Amino acid sequence: MSEDTPPVGPVVDATPAQFPGAVTLGGRFGTVERLDASRHAPALWTAMRGQDAIWSYLPPGPFADPTTFNTYIAASEQNQERIFYTVLDNDRRAVGFFSLMEIRPAMRVIEVGNVVYAPALQRTPLSTEAQYLLARYAFETLGYRRYEWKCNALNAASRRAAARLGFTFEGIFRQHMIVKGRSRD
C-alpha cells in the first residue's frame, strides 16, 4: 500500500444474510418461536394485562381490553418488516415477545427490538436464554455479522439488560423517534 492510499476497512464476506422466518428455537428453560396470534395472544394477554408500565417506552399499548390487544398481536404477526417471536416457558405458556427488525441482509445487520416481557419473565434465566437463542439464530443460521439493541435513553431497565447481555453502548440517537407524543432519544 502506498502512502497515497487512504486507510480502508478489512475485507469481509459480502454474501447477504438470510431473511428471518418461522423457526422454533429450543432451550433449557423454554422456547422461542414465531408469533402466532391465535395460539399466543390469549396467554400473552393473561400474562401482561394490568402491567401498563411494560408499555411505557414502546409505541403501542397499554391495552385496555383483550380485543384491542389481540388486534395488535395479529398485526404484529402479519408484519413483514419486523418479524415477531414469542417466548414460551417450559409449560408452553407465552410469557413475552420480541422482534427482529431493521433487517438489512445486504449489510448483514439486524436489530432485536419490541421486547415485551411479562413480569414473570423479566430478569429470569429464560429471559436471558431467549435473547441468546434469537442472537444465535441471527448469527449462526442467518449469517448476520452485527446484532443491534436500541432502546429509549430513559429506559434504565432496558439499558441494564443490554449491558448484561453483552451489548456495547455506542451512543444515543438524539431525537430518534416520537413515541406517544414524546421525543425519544
What does each model-identified segment do?
Residues 162:
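Conserved active-site tyrosine of GNAT-family acetyltransferases
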Residues 134:
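Alpha-helical, largely C-terminal catalytic domains
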Residues 168-183:
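Conserved catalytic-core motifs of GNAT/GCN5-like acyltransferases
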Residues 127:
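Glycine-rich acyl-CoA binding loop
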Residues 140-150:
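Conserved GNAT acetyl-CoA-binding A-motif
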Residues 149-159:
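Conserved beta-strand-loop-alpha-helix junction that forms the acyl-donor binding cleft
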Residues 1-124, 137, 141, 182-184:
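GNAT-family acyltransferases
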